[in-house]
Amino acid sequence: MFYYIYELLNFNIFQYITVRAGFSFFIAFCLTVYLMPKFIAWAKAKNAAQPIYELAPQTHQKKAKTPTMGGLVFIGAAVFATLLCARLDNVFVVASLLCLVGFSALGFKDDLNKILGGKNHDGLSPRAKLAVQVLIGLVVSSLLYFHGELGSKFYLPFYKFALLDLGVFAIVFWTIVIVAASNAVNLTDGLDGLASVPAIFSLLTLGVFAYICGHAVFSTYLLLPKIVGVGETVIIAAALIGSLMGFLWFNCHPAEVFMGDSGSLSVGAYIGLMGVMTKNEILLIIIGFVFVMETLSVILQVGSFKIFKKRIFLMAPIHHHFEIKGWVENKIIVRFWLIAILANLIALTALKIR
């Protein structure tokens, strides 16, 4: 809406992406901070609490009555801010909104099933959840491939030339990236604030890349792929950062609310989508290193047990391993945040080292 105010009234300030990104950040933050206490009160009244996994560390049992599905509030706030501040005739914005809303709706259904069933395993089956994730990923990826300026070239970090052209197979590759990122953040969301802050850092880094790739002068100077229109996604990233910060106000230890799958699946999917839209699919390994670390711990744990009948970790994902070893929750969370900061600083060096 703000961009169209500029077009109608020639109010120049709203033509700038950075200005509209600033507005989207504050709108999403303020809306989340305003609505979240109301949602928490409603969720408590309806007993919409997070079922705790039976095998989770004993310290988690005290969280049994904590409301969940907070993701509905902050994703809703981010979408609202985007509708106000971004250009809705931009294919990257449309794809982003489809991604956020689609994955959040899937997460809501999963959360609702768990609440109604009363147990953590009463959610959607892994196959059903994966099938819907893949379907949404394919729709979003196809939209970008057939209607966007993204192209299908594949880039490696720290290398300025495209490695190869994936052609139509880019749709499959992008879908894998989006779904993998969605599930990685979902696995990480096991401690108060553990997923939120690394997600904020990831979105900040990807927002920088999106702004530069969408800028004709900066992208040429820094030898990044020039992608017309992708700079508009900075507004969505800013909205999501703002809403996540608003959510963190209530989710920091001890949490008053959990994001649930309604939030984690959507946030992860959008991080993956931003990696796709900025041609940083492989750099996502560094940008989202905490999420990768958590996911690999699960893969290694399951693989080791199936093949060798032995467990590598006391429990997976790896944050549970440290809990069982006796680390207090805050120590695990802050140390993982520090890892996320360092990883994203390393990722940002790809702007100059090419």
From Swiss-Prot:
It is found in: Cell inner membrane. Its cofactor is Mg(2+). The chain crosses the membrane at residues 23-43, 66-86, 88-108, 130-150, 161-181, 193-213, 230-250, 257-277, 282-302, 331-351. Its main location: membrane. Pathway: Cell wall biogenesis; peptidoglycan biosynthesis. Its EC number is 2.7.8.13. It catalyses: UDP-N-acetyl-alpha-D-muramoyl-L-alanyl-gamma-D-glutamyl-meso-2,6-diaminopimeloyl-D-alanyl-D-alanine + di-trans,octa-cis-undecaprenyl phosphate = di-trans,octa-cis-undecaprenyl diphospho-N-acetyl-alpha-D-muramoyl-L-alanyl-D-glutamyl-meso-2,6-diaminopimeloyl-D-alanyl-D-alanine + UMP. It holds the Pfam family Glycos_transf_4. Catalyzes the initial step of the lipid cycle reactions in the biosynthesis of the cell wall peptidoglycan: transfers peptidoglycan precursor phospho-MurNAc-pentapeptide from UDP-MurNAc-pentapeptide onto the lipid carrier undecaprenyl phosphate, yielding undecaprenyl-pyrophosphoryl-MurNAc-pentapeptide, known as lipid I. Belongs to the glycosyltransferase 4 family. MraY subfamily. This is Phospho-N-acetylmuramoyl-pentapeptide-transferase. It comes from Campylobacter curvus (strain 525.92).
